[in-house]
Design a protein with these regions (language model features):
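Surface-exposed loop and membrane-interface regions of Gram-negative outer-membrane beta-barrel proteins
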Residues: 33-36, 86-155, 271
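Outer-membrane beta-barrel "beta-signal"
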Residues: 246-250, 273-287
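Detector for outer-membrane/organellar transmembrane beta-barrel domains
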Residues: 155-232, 258-259, 285-286
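Residues that define the transmembrane beta-barrel architecture of outer-membrane proteins
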Residues: 49, 71-75, 110-114, 127, ...
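Short glycine/proline- and aromatic-enriched beta-strand/turn motifs that initiate or cap beta-hairpins
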Residues: 29-98, 219, 278, 284
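Repeated loop/turn-to-beta-strand initiation elements of outer-membrane beta-barrel proteins
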Residues: 85-90, 125-131, 169-176, 204-212, ...
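Transmembrane beta-strands of outer-membrane beta-barrel pores
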Residues: 57-63, 83-85, 92-96, 122, ...
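Cleavable N-terminal export/targeting peptides
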Residues: 1-50
Length: 287
């Protein structure tokens, strides 16, 4: 496939990434202003720290358009800590990447994804910014037939991200996030990902708090391995989703979502990593 706007989007993504990294902290709420700090203040005001946890059950785990559970269900959960503008967390999900034979015994290629992330976020007026780093790990997926580490099976990778979001009208939020990995999954070289999302909160009815949301993502890679393993022979692909999240009983939510990609249906078919259209339901509890 050929994307005529790929180059302009990539340049825009680079500009947004640099602006968020270099200019983000200067936009933060609460930054000292000239003459605003009283001379009698000798210590900064303590920043509140919070800790939360979540657990979810999904009919399928989709990541950037690809099924991570071979069209099967997933159990997921994580912990998040926030202290001032700094945040950090860990999140995990069950996986089903298929079965391979190791030393004559069937073994699951990868049974779990474990993400560790941290960053800084703030707000200036109606615009929020977020810069961070994410480490994606897949325990057990880097073994060869002898059970030892093998570079050919390397799947873990690191991404840095920068995002901006803001309210465009009452309860309607538009956000743009850029991700970059210097060595993406499956040893596929440097990869850029641009996501644009929108969410609209609706009035509460019958004890339900609905939010409509949609997201479009575009990913680019410049390595032959990326084209062969991720983008169906091309140097980029597009993915999108749209759905509704229903909050209830304060800490519970149900998300109903439609996913699809621009990838060829022949490339998307198979026993694992399906990337055609599908519907996903997720029940989540946060505390």
């Amino acid at each position: 496939m050929t994307w005529t706007i790929a180059k302009s989007l990539r340049l825009g993504a680079l500009g947004l990434f640099a602006a968020a990294l270099l200019g983000g902290p200067a936009l933060a709420d609460g930054m000292p202003k000239r003459g605003a700090v009283k001379k009698t203040e000798t210590t900064p005001e303590p920043r509140a720290c919070t800790l939360s946890a979540n657990v979810a059950l999904a009919t399928e785990y989709i990541f950037r358009g690809f099924s991570q559970t071979a069209e099967g269900p997933a159990i997921q959960g994580g912990f998040d800590a926030t202290c001032g503008r700094f945040y950090a967390g860990v999140w995990a999900s069950s996986l089903d990447w298929g079965v391979v034979e190791r030393r004559g015994v069937d073994d699951t290629w990868a049974y779990m994804e474990l993400d560790v992330y941290a960053g800084f976020k703030g707000k200036h007026g109606h615009v929020a910014w977020d810069v961070g780093v994410i480490y994606y790990a897949y325990p057990n997926s880097t073994r060869n037939d002898f059970g030892t580490f093998d570079e050919r099976f390397r799947n873990e990778y690191v991404e840095v991200k920068a995002g901006l979001s803001g309210e465009v009208w009452k309860d309607g939020t538009l956000g743009v996030t850029v991700f970059f990995s210097p060595d993406y999954q499956y040893e596929t070289g440097d990869v850029w990902t641009l996501e644009v999302g929108f969410a609209q909160a609706l009035p509460k009815h019958w004890g339900l708090t609905p939010t409509l949301s949609a997201l479009v993502g575009q990913q680019w890679g410049n390595d032959g391995a990326y084209a062969a393993r991720v983008a169906g022979g091309e140097d980029s692909y597009t993915y999108w989703n749209a759905g509704v999240t229903l909050g209830f009983l304060e800490k519970w939510s149900i998300d109903l979502r439609y996913w699809d990609t621009s990838l060829d249906r022949d490339f998307c078919s198979g026993p694992t990593f399906q990337c055609d259209e599908r519907f996903v339901a997720t029940l989540k509890f946060t505390y």
